[in-house]
Amino acid sequence: MKKICYFINSDWYFELHWVERALAAKAAGYEIHVVSHFVGDDIQQKLSEKGFICHDSSVSELSINPINFFGSLTKVWSLLKKINPDVLHCITIKPCLMGGFFARFYNKPIILGFVGLGRVFMEDKLSMNVIRYLTLHSYNHIFKNPKCLLAFEHEHDRDRLLALTEAKKSQTVVIDGAGINPDIYHYSLEINREKPVVLFASRLLWSKGLGDLVEVKKRLVHKGVDFVLNVAGISIVDDPDAIPLSQIEEWHQQGLINWLGRCSDVYSLIEASNVVALPSTYSEGIPRILLEASSVGRACIAYDVGGCQSLIIDEYTGSLVEMRNIDVLAVKLEQLLTSPTKRVEMGVRSRERIESKFASSLVIDDTLKLYQRAIANGTY
């Protein structure tokens, strides 16, 4: 039985974004291995019950300590050598680097999954500039592997990395995000409320844009355009970009947000909303919350950045706003809040766009074809 090994930083990220594709690969006859940093036993047990073989990498998601990196690299190489995968599929920067070096050394087929380029390519600090330089230098070495394929979620990231590295366009592919299953995320008509509901559901990082939404809330309420800002999300305690929980609770006490905490049933939150907002400046792929909202038929508003830009067609399926332009964000959100007919029309078109371009069945089919080609030809 041929082996596919997924190497990814976060166990929760694999469970949220990659399980459907991994299950499809398993159903196609592959033995599935998952190498990740498993925090506790909960997710690892769930994945094992699905028939995946799980391995703990102990790779810290947030640490930029080079000693820790090389210590983890030794363990990961030993683990990957033991697994001996026919295809290694790495997701996010650290796995791409560690797995990339491994595949180059052992001449293995590898897919490097760029689900956004990460904060290394966002922050202009001395430490990040050094890490970015080393990362790009490492990428150039890794990309020389003829069995290496670079998989992106949107064209913006592909164009940027091609401009920054010696990679060839012929060794790249764009697959439209993680996809979403429209048979699970059903279309529904929104409830037209006297006080509309805007949903923000994401990790609680400043770069995800909640602070900008709170500022917009203040401005619109002052104008007499009130709305409920529902906030659901994951608090990342050790992340320097994290919004302190004390700040979240303060906004809640002030009536600026309705803090819901971490919610497992995001689908119900989307159904209960009129608009879904994600004014993110984070370098990411296509945000899942926007895929889910579009499938349910909700108008979305987001900053005009790579992943959001590839999903939302401005003023047709939703609203795009110049990054960090809070004035325009306020204007466009007000337009959505005061135009129920416009929202519904956008929602219908969003659903159609999901079915034709972003359905998970399409993403799964494209991904399985990459595995088949790699195993049949030893290259892409």
For each predicted feature, which ranges?
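Conserved donor-binding/catalytic core segment of Leloir-type glycosyltransferases
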Residues: C5, E190-K208, V214-K217, L229-N230
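Acidic anion/phosphate-binding donor-loop and adjacent secondary structure
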Residues: I64-I67, L162-A163, D176-K195, S273, ...
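Membrane-proximal helix-turn-helix segments that form the acceptor-binding/catalytic region
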Residues: L23-A25, T74-W77, F105, V130-L150
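A short, active-site helix/loop in glycosyltransferases that binds the activated sugar's phosphate group
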Residues: K144-T172, G179-P182, T367
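Conserved acidic donor-binding segment of nucleotide-sugar-dependent glycosyltransferases
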Residues: D314-E315, S319-I326, Q335-P340
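Nucleotide-activated donor-binding/catalytic signature segment of Leloir-type glycosyltransferases, i.e.
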Residues: A242-C263
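A short, well-ordered alpha-helix in the C-terminal region of glycosyltransferases
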Residues: V328, Q335, K342-K357, V363-K369
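Short hydrophobic beta-strand element within catalytic cores of glycosyltransferases
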Residues: L290, A299-A302, I312
